[in-house]
UniProtKB/Swiss-Prot annotation:
The keyword Hydrolase applies. PANTHER family: HYDROGENASE 1 MATURATION PROTEASE, HYDROGENASE 2 MATURATION PROTEASE. This is Hydrogenase expression/formation protein HupD. Keywords: Aspartyl protease, Hydrolase, Metal-binding, Nickel, Protease. Gene3D superfamilies: HybD-like (3.40.50.1450). The lineage of its organism: Bacteria, Pseudomonadati, Pseudomonadota, Gammaproteobacteria, Chromatiales. Ni(2+) binds at E20, D66, H97. It comes from Thiocapsa roseopersicina. Belongs to the peptidase A31 family. CDD domains: H2MP_MemB-H2up (cd06062).
Amino acid sequence: MRSDPEILVLGIGNLLWADEGFGVRAVEALQRHWVMSSNVQLLDGGTQGIYLVDRVRKADVLVVFDAVDYGLPPGTMKRVEDDEVPRFLGAKKMSLHQTGFQEVLALAAMLGDYPKHLLLIGVQPVELDDFGGSLRPQIKERITPAIEMALEYLAQFGVVARRREDSTVDSPHLPHPSLDLIAYESGRPGPEIACRIGDERVLTSLSARTVQPGNPHGDRQ
């Protein structure tokens, strides 16, 4: 008797850099609003990269949400399947996590445990260079259609999904309350307190080391 396939739905990206968080937010919304078949595992992969390889190796079916530079207009959502997925993840890398996930897929293939079915649901980001920022409205609007696309794809593998009556579900798979989308957006300090382009301590340090005319070694102490 054929057993149900092991299915992994994975969101990758970085919540701290605006639209980079699309994949993580998509899985968060899926966990919060839908109950899935018991053979489906939802995972916030964040920027873990190579550390995800064991999870990927166990999956027969892998669905990935991510912000991807397709070279398309901002906000465009695009699906890519099977052997095309690594090529699109690597075409225009926007962050180190994409390099890491390419390596995850390559290592899984090398070890002979590559998913039989692979779907990438990506969205072209609007803004990435906003440290501590949230999804832009144009990207946030893509979460629901991205989830619908994933559920339609998973239905062919016998996955049954039903809406939760209460979206305040308490789950270890959801982010820390401080990183919940609403809390994250409403609790963000103003630009006079929180630098928008990175850690101000690091930026100040780098600025102090900038080479000035007549001072080839910078302002090092």
